[in-house]
């Protein structure tokens, strides 16, 4: 297997394949990220990671390994091996001739011919192509637009300011070619025909006319090819600049703007809208060159044939308004299609992000139907645009012929006799006009319309509301609302506080009459620890967001004196090493790092991770448990040196003992002397804070220390323990994680820790697969099969052949007509009018047939393409949703999304156009060859030679370009992954001032992509240039051959030369399009690759194995010798090990254990989400024998990470309209959300933002609880379902569950012991085994192992006594 490279810098991952591994650079060791080295070069590391070779190959450290990883950067750097730096781009050192002739591409062609290219074979991007430089220039230009008060900002003006001369200069070259060289060609053609027709005036100059023809063709090639490349190059740079600008803007969006702008929309801007820049700037010059050319050529033709010239030109001009209308329609259609594409991508993005929850709800099929419906609507809109393209393709072929027909018929009707010179001069001139007026000008109109539509979408995004620049430095910072300046008297008081808030009012929705925070007055002293508590949805997180500056104040005053660090309520990790996630761009301080790791209770996890803190954690921390993610996020915040730490409920995701450790050792220990604002629901810690803030409905309900609030009774109202118990919590003993009770073995990575992203235990990351070799015929067959099958293909092919027969027949008939007229004139005979009329009728019939057949063939092909796109998309979406969870752990979110965005965009829009081009050009070339062979069969010799040369050149080109296209596609995926990850962690990124670090990483990914894309367009243009040169040689042979083998008359010369001249554009374009077809088919290849995904199992069992509709009636659950692993590798270590236990019907079972003990894996086994041995029986039925939906529909789940979808509240509760509004309101009332939803503008129809960001995490968990109540299943699973809600709401919810699910079996995973202390039984798990299982009271008093006893005891003496009392009462009442 070839080594797969990884380009540095790599924020997203460190990729490896087999023996190839990536070692962090010294900058990575010091900063947590790979930054650019001084020459900004991309590099590939080939050294092993910082463990011994044996340990690396095994994927874990051996017992005897003495080379254990440390966080000491000096020790690490001592093991570094020399990097392999990517070489300088040969274009950077090429001279003028080399650049003009594309000689600098020879090394990559040579390498591509010998081997399969990958990222290691690329070069560093040119200085002018670097993303950061281009982004800086365009951002500066856009800022000038924003500061111009006199007019609306224009992205077009901003682009022209930066790239204007590079876009304008090619217009001069196009002007010279079109109005100079191409206009001269017909003149010399006429002279050459005159020579072979025996005209006396041309007798001595025929050879010179032939040479002039050849020279003009050569000059056209030498000017246009570099010009085309130059425009592609500048378009590519514009795209990079806009991508960088969009990413920077995304990092500045306010929460409100982010709610209105979905991540799918931002991804679509970069994947679909920006690439439309690639073609419009080239054709736009024809909007002014084309009209000038029409005037000049019309004048020249008028000089020769008089008013007849106007007939054809007017016909061509009459199509211009139609083209303008179609351009407008195309713009409107594209905008509508883009909106529908945004909607589809948003849905796909949400589904992929929440796939596990979707599977547990058994919602795959209904959501698949929704995406299918969205896809149909999207493709119906795209089809309208394709039909316009089909009309345009047909028009291109027949327009010049109709124009020629009108001019010649007019010329004949006027009583004049046309000669070969007249006929082929008109033909040549109209062919020139065809290129300009029928191809380039209409294309310019359509592409400019599409370009402007995309520009408007980017402009709209760039004008979205953004946060003001806030300087979170060591000095004081203010957020003072205009109109409410602080008085001089208050200034000194403000500076005495770490955080000072005066009369603050703020709201997320500017249109809402209600404030999220209202009348907030708060002074936080430097060095104090402040706890913020309150009911779910009371505004705790919003207060933190206001301090961060994320929630803008509507009135009042907020001042922060000092630098901030922040831990979010929902842990945010990116796909990188644990160390990268903790350092997050900060310099490496070994002593501080070790201290933070210890205080955040991560040492044990590091010891057991395959590569310690250099282990890849997976995208969004997918391979870690919730507790591990929370502690790594906390460590990131704590490692950052700041004076103020904002911790948004980091203790809810960990168990009681770890929470005690984090509070004692981290909050009160390591952060002693710093200001800490801690949002928490853990009341046992309240006696040990300096100040408590109680929030209710966005207002401060009470403020003070523990003793004063205890006397008011406000604290007691929040908890489940008695007032006496809480008073005794001051006697709690500090937690010692090194005590014997805490040295039980723990699994390092959560339930899917058995493999990291790479699917093994090595801690390495999965590398996206790159195909090799050519595109197989089977792939084409699969594509056309998806488009309607063999019959549809044959009908379309037959129609295309008939269309070309009609077109070639028209050309041949014209030659026949010219010969007939000239022969009659040569004999002094006049052809009768009846005969002339018959010729006119015949020619008219041929033209009409050409129009009909070309339209038919184009529409048929586009219809096939539309069907293929829909079926391919729906097929792979079905495969993805049916894939097992292992697939999602080894494939990045961005990589999967890439298939549904850029790859499907290629299949939808690019591939049909290329297919039409290839088919029509192939048939056109066949027609030309037939015509040439009919005139002089000997000309088939150079034609055959040309074909052989082109065939070998094409193969040489394809081997290189196909690999470059694949590498380009693979290098594109990290751009989307990085963008999506950054949008998810926006608050954390901004709070830690990491925007610049993230921007550099995004720029590095764009540079890696640019490296591949630039070489792709370079090799493409080099190939085109080479073919053009060969075409010039071919035309030279054809033209000069007439002097060696004189034809019978000038008409044959005119026919052959006009046909051969078309080859200079047609052949090179055709061969390039066949190559482009193969390259575009790589998108189909990447899409079809997902068709081979193995499904996780049948959804519905056969009738004989399907459980009864009333199943399960009892809710008994039996585990028999169950083993579970997260990889299909049967030899992999099991995460759950030989579990055997029985849960009785209607039993309430609490499941506890340290982070990574296997609690959530138990739930995965119940839902059959992973690979298992042994059996799970529910009411005596083996769940392995039934369909997945038969099983999952009968189990309700409240997941650990609550998931809401963008849409309405009703849609999130009941996406398929199965229940009445009354039923929904009843469920909301039972979970204490009725009042919250009632206060929304539209009640159940109120909008939910993407990811449910306009609701707190606790409220989202309550919505998930409402879903479970709606389903009324016999078995309920709660995985940390109330971890983020306050104790009072938790108590009310527990009461609701006890009432609503009295006759149900309930499994509850919880870190809060009081949540499960009244359960019938408690299951204690550790290292994937059940170590205790019994009633809570018995486990606390009679158990020999005392694991549960010790766990409860660690919560403190007072808490232990209160929990024991509740357990005893439950035991005695059972």
From Swiss-Prot:
<feature type="transmembrane region" description="Helical">
    <location>
        <begin position="305"/>
        <end position="325"/>
    </location>
</feature>
<feature type="region of interest" description="Disordered">
    <location>
        <begin position="466"/>
        <end position="492"/>
    </location>
</feature>
<dbReference type="Pfam" id="PF00664">
    <property type="entry name" value="ABC_membrane"/>
</dbReference>
<keyword id="KW-0677">Repeat</keyword>
<feature type="domain" description="ABC transmembrane type-1 1">
    <location>
        <begin position="168"/>
        <end position="449"/>
    </location>
</feature>
<feature type="transmembrane region" description="Helical">
    <location>
        <begin position="938"/>
        <end position="958"/>
    </location>
</feature>
<keyword id="KW-0217">Developmental protein</keyword>
<dbReference type="InterPro" id="IPR027417">
    <property type="entry name" value="P-loop_NTPase"/>
</dbReference>
<comment type="function">
    <text>Vital for development.</text>
</comment>
<feature type="transmembrane region" description="Helical">
    <location>
        <begin position="1025"/>
        <end position="1045"/>
    </location>
</feature>
<feature type="domain" description="ABC transporter 2">
    <location>
        <begin position="1119"/>
        <end position="1352"/>
    </location>
</feature>
<keyword id="KW-0067">ATP-binding</keyword>
<dbReference type="Pfam" id="PF00005">
    <property type="entry name" value="ABC_tran"/>
</dbReference>
<dbReference type="GO" id="GO:0042626">
    <property type="term" value="F:ATPase-coupled transmembrane transporter activity"/>
</dbReference>
<dbReference type="InterPro" id="IPR003593">
    <property type="entry name" value="AAA+_ATPase"/>
</dbReference>
<feature type="binding site">
    <location>
        <begin position="534"/>
        <end position="541"/>
    </location>
    <ligand>
        <name>ATP 1</name>
    </ligand>
</feature>
<dbReference type="GO" id="GO:0016020">
    <property type="term" value="C:membrane"/>
</dbReference>
<dbReference type="InterPro" id="IPR036640">
    <property type="entry name" value="ABC1_TM_sf"/>
</dbReference>
<feature type="glycosylation site" description="N-linked (GlcNAc...) asparagine">
    <location>
        <position position="561"/>
    </location>
</feature>
<keyword id="KW-0547">Nucleotide-binding</keyword>
<feature type="domain" description="ABC transmembrane type-1 2">
    <location>
        <begin position="793"/>
        <end position="1079"/>
    </location>
</feature>
<feature type="transmembrane region" description="Helical">
    <location>
        <begin position="205"/>
        <end position="225"/>
    </location>
</feature>
<dbReference type="InterPro" id="IPR011527">
    <property type="entry name" value="ABC1_TM_dom"/>
</dbReference>
<protein>
    <recommendedName>
        <fullName>Probable multidrug resistance-associated protein lethal(2)03659</fullName>
    </recommendedName>
</protein>
<dbReference type="InterPro" id="IPR044746">
    <property type="entry name" value="ABCC_6TM_D1"/>
</dbReference>
<dbReference type="GO" id="GO:0008514">
    <property type="term" value="F:organic anion transmembrane transporter activity"/>
</dbReference>
<dbReference type="GO" id="GO:0015562">
    <property type="term" value="F:efflux transmembrane transporter activity"/>
</dbReference>
<keyword id="KW-0813">Transport</keyword>
<feature type="glycosylation site" description="N-linked (GlcNAc...) asparagine">
    <location>
        <position position="1254"/>
    </location>
</feature>
<feature type="transmembrane region" description="Helical">
    <location>
        <begin position="404"/>
        <end position="424"/>
    </location>
</feature>
<dbReference type="InterPro" id="IPR050173">
    <property type="entry name" value="ABC_transporter_C-like"/>
</dbReference>
<dbReference type="GO" id="GO:0015711">
    <property type="term" value="P:organic anion transport"/>
</dbReference>
<feature type="domain" description="ABC transporter 1">
    <location>
        <begin position="499"/>
        <end position="722"/>
    </location>
</feature>
<feature type="transmembrane region" description="Helical">
    <location>
        <begin position="426"/>
        <end position="446"/>
    </location>
</feature>
<feature type="transmembrane region" description="Helical">
    <location>
        <begin position="787"/>
        <end position="807"/>
    </location>
</feature>
<keyword id="KW-0325">Glycoprotein</keyword>
<feature type="region of interest" description="Disordered">
    <location>
        <begin position="1"/>
        <end position="40"/>
    </location>
</feature>
<keyword id="KW-0812">Transmembrane</keyword>
<feature type="transmembrane region" description="Helical">
    <location>
        <begin position="159"/>
        <end position="179"/>
    </location>
</feature>
<keyword id="KW-1133">Transmembrane helix</keyword>
<feature type="transmembrane region" description="Helical">
    <location>
        <begin position="282"/>
        <end position="302"/>
    </location>
</feature>
<feature type="transmembrane region" description="Helical">
    <location>
        <begin position="913"/>
        <end position="933"/>
    </location>
</feature>
């Amino acid at each position: 297997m070839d080594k797969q490279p990884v380009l540095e810098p790599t924020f997203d991952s460190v990729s490896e394949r087999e023996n190839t591994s990536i070692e962090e650079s010294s900058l990575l060791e010091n900063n947590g990220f790979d930054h650019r080295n001084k020459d900004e070069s991309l590099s590939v590391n080939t050294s092993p990671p910082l463990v011994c070779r044996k340990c690396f190959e095994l994927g874990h450290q051996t017992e005897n390994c003495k080379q254990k990883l440390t966080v000491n950067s000096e020790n690490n750097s001592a093991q570094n091996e020399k990097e392999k730096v990517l070489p300088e781009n040969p274009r950077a050192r090429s001279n003028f001739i080399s650049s003009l002739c594309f000689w600098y591409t020879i090394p990559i062609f040579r390498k591509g011919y010998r081997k399969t290219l990958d990222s290691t074979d690329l070069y560093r991007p040119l200085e002018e192509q670097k993303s950061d430089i281009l982004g800086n220039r365009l951002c500066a230009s856009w800022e000038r637009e924003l500061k111009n008060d006199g007019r609306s900002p224009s992205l077009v003006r901003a682009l022209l300011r930066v790239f204007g001369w590079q876009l304008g200069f090619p217009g001069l070259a196009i002007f010279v070619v079109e109005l100079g060289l191409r206009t001269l060609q017909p003149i010399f053609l006429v002279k050459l025909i005159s020579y072979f027709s025996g005209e006396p005036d041309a007798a001595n100059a025929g050879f010179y006319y032939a040479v002039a023809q050849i020279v003009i063709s050569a000059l056209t090639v030498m000017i246009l090819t570099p010009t085309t490349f130059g425009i592609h190059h500048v378009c590519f740079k514009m795209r990079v600049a806009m991508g960088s600008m969009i990413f920077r803007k995304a990092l500045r969006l306010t929460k409100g703007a982010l709610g209105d702008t979905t991540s799918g929309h931002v991804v679509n801007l970069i994947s679909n809208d920006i690439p439309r820049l690639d073609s419009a700037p080239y054709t736009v010059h024809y909007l002014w060159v084309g009209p000038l050319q029409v005037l000049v050529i019309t004048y020249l033709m008028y000089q020769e044939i008089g008013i007849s010239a106007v007939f054809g030109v007017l016909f061509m001009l009459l199509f211009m308004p139609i083209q303008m209308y179609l351009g407008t329609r195309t713009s409107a259609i594209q905008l509508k299609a883009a909106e529908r594409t945004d909607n589809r991508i948003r849905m796909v993005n949400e589904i992929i992000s929440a796939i596990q929850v979707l599977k547990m709800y058994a919602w795959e099929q209904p959501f698949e139907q929704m995406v299918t419906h969205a896809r149909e609507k999207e493709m119906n809109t795209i089809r309208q645009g394709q039909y316009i393209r089909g009309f345009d393709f047909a028009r291109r072929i027949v327009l010049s012929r109709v124009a020629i027909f009108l001019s010649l018929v007019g010329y004949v009707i006027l009583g004049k006799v046309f000669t070969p010179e007249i006929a082929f001069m008109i033909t040549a001139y109209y062919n020139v006009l065809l290129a300009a007026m029928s191809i380039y000008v209409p294309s310019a109109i359509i592409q400019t319309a599409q370009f402007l539509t995309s520009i408007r979408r980017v402009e709209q995004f760039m004008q979205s509301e953004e946060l003001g620049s806030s300087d979170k430095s060591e000095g004081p910072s203010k957020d003072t609302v205009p109109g409410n300046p602080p008085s001089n008297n208050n200034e000194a008081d403000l500076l005495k506080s770490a955080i000072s808030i005066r009369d603050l009012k703020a709201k997320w929705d500017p249109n809402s009459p209600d404030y999220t925070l209202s009348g907030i007055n708060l002074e936080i002293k430097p060095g104090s620890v402040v706890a913020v508590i309150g009911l779910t949805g009371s505004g705790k997180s919003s207060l933190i967001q206001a301090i961060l500056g994320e929630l803008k104040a509507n009135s009042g005053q907020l001042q922060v004196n000092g630098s901030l660090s922040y831990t979010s309520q929902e842990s945010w990790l990116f796909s990188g090493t644990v160390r990268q996630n903790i350092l997050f761009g900060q310099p490496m301080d070994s002593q501080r790092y070790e201290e933070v790791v210890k205080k955040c209770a991560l040492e044990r996890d590091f010891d057991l991770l395959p590569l310690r803190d250099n282990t890849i954690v997976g995208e969004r921390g997918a391979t870690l448990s919730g507790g591990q993610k929370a502690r790594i996020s906390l460590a990131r915040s704590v490692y950052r040196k700041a004076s103020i730490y904002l911790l948004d409920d980091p203790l809810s995701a960990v168990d009681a003992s770890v929470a005690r450790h984090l509070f004692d050792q981290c909050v009160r220990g390591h952060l002693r002397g710093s200001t800490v604002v801690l949002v928490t629901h853990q009341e046992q810690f309240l006696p040990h804070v300096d100040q408590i803030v109680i929030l209710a409905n966005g207002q401060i309900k009470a403020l003070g220390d523990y003793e004063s609030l205890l006397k008011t009774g406000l604290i007691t109202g929040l908890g489940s323990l008695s007032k006496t118990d809480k008073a005794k919590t001051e006697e709690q003993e500090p937690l010692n994680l090194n005590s014997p009770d805490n040295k039980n073995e723990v699994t390092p990575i959560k339930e899917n820790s058995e493999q990291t992203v790479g699917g093994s235990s090595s801690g390495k990351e999965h590398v996206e697969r790159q195909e090799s070799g050519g595109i197989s015929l089977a792939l084409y067959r699969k594509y056309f099969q998806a488009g309607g099958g063999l019959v549809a293909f044959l009908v379309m092919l037959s129609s295309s052949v008939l269309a070309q027969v009609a077109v070639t027949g028209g050309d041949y008939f014209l030659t026949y007509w010219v010969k007939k007229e000239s022969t009659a004139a040569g004999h002094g005979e006049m052809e009768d009018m009846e005969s002339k009329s018959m010729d006119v009728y015949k020619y008219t019939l041929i033209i009409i047939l050409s129009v009909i057949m070309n339209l038919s063939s184009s529409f048929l092909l586009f219809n096939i393409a539309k069907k293929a796109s829909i079926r391919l998309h729906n097929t792979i979406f079905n495969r993805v949703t049916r894939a097992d969870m292992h697939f999602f752990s080894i494939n990045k979110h961005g990589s999967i999304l890439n298939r549904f965005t850029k790859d499907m965009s290629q299949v939808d829009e690019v591939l049909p156009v290329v297919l039409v081009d290839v088919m029509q050009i192939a048939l056109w070339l066949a027609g030309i060859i037939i015509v040439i062979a009919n005139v002089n069969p000997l000309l088939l010799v150079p034609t055959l030679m040309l074909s052989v040369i082109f065939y070998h050149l094409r193969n040489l080109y394809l081997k290189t370009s196909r690999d470059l296209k694949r590498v380009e596609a693979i290098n594109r995926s990290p751009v989307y992954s990085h963008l999506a990850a950054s949008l998810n962690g926006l608050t954390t990124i901004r709070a830690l001032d990491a925007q610049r670090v993230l921007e550099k990483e995004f720029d590095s990914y764009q540079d890696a992509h640019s490296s591949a894309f630039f070489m792709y367009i370079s090799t493409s243009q080099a190939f085109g240039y080479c073919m053009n040169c060969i075409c010039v040689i071919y035309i030279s042979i054809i033209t000069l051959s007439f002097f060696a083998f004189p034809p019978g008359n000038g008409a044959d010369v005119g026919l052959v030369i006009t046909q051969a001249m078309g080859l200079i554009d047609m052949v090179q374009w055709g061969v390039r399009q066949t190559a482009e077809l193969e390259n575009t088919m790589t998108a189909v290849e990447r899409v079809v690759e997902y068709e081979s995904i193995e499904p996780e199992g049948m959804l519905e069992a056969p009738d004989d194995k399907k459980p009864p509709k009333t199943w399960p009636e009892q809710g008994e659950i039996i585990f028999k010798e169950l083993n579970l692993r997260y990889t299909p590798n049967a030899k992999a270590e099991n995460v759950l090990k030989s579990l055997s236990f029985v849960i009785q019907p209607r039993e309430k079972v609490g499941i506890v254990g340290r982070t990574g003990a296997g609690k959530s894996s138990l739930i995965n086994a119940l839902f059959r989400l992973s690979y298992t041995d042994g059996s799970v029986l529910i009411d005596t039925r083996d769940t392995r024998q039934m369909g997945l939906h038969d099983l999952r529909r009968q189990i309700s789940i409240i997941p650990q990470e609550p998931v809401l979808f963008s849409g309405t509240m009703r849609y999130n509760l009941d996406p398929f309209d199965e229940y009445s509004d009354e039923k929904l309101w009843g469920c909301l009332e039972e979970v204490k959300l009725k009042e919250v939803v009632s206060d929304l503008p539209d009640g159940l129809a109120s909008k939910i933002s993407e990811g449910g960001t306009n609701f707190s995490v606790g409220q989202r968990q309550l919505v998930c609880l409402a879903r479970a109540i709606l389903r009324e299943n016999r078995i309920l699973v709660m995985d940390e379902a109330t971890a983020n809600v306050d104790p009072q709401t938790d108590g009310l919810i527990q009461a609701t569950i006890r009432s609503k699910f009295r006759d149900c079996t309930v499994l509850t995973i919880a870190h809060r012991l009081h949540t499960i202390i009244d359960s019938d039984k408690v299951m204690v798990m550790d290292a994937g085994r059940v170590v205790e299982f019994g009633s809570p009271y018995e486990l606390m008093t009679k158990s020999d192992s005392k694991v549960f006893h010790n766990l409860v005891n660690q919560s403190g003496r007072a808490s232990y006594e209160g929990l024991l009392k509740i357990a005893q009462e439950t035991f005695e009442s059972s």
